[in-house]
């Protein structure tokens, strides 16, 4: 029996966590990967599936965000990407894409090639972009 596209997606997300994001401190929560700091800054990478997915294909994009805990606010270790002060799509900041982009999994897709493509955008674009922000104040200074 061939693997479903949903199973292929889940396996891909688990591998991305294990090999790319977990070594940098991100914790997995479904399709969300978060890292929280004691200084009130949180970072999230979210894999958003298309609402139009079907059994034959699974499209997804990569969202990212910078969360800032407000003074006097209780910490929220399960913040969502839409809770963030700064939000961006991974493809928007990548010189390779520069626009909205949705990756697609389908029967026969070369998953090793797809993993390599995602690993590249995460390590070359997303994580370095996020590393520019080390504190809440860095996010506030961006004016976003």
Task: Please identify what each model-predicted range represents.
Residues 1-9, 14, 28, 35-144:
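Intrinsically disordered, low-complexity regulatory regions enriched in serine/threonine/proline
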Residues 18:
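Short glycine-/small-residue-rich flexible loop motifs, especially phosphate/cofactor-binding loops
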Residues 21:
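Pyridoxal 5′-phosphate
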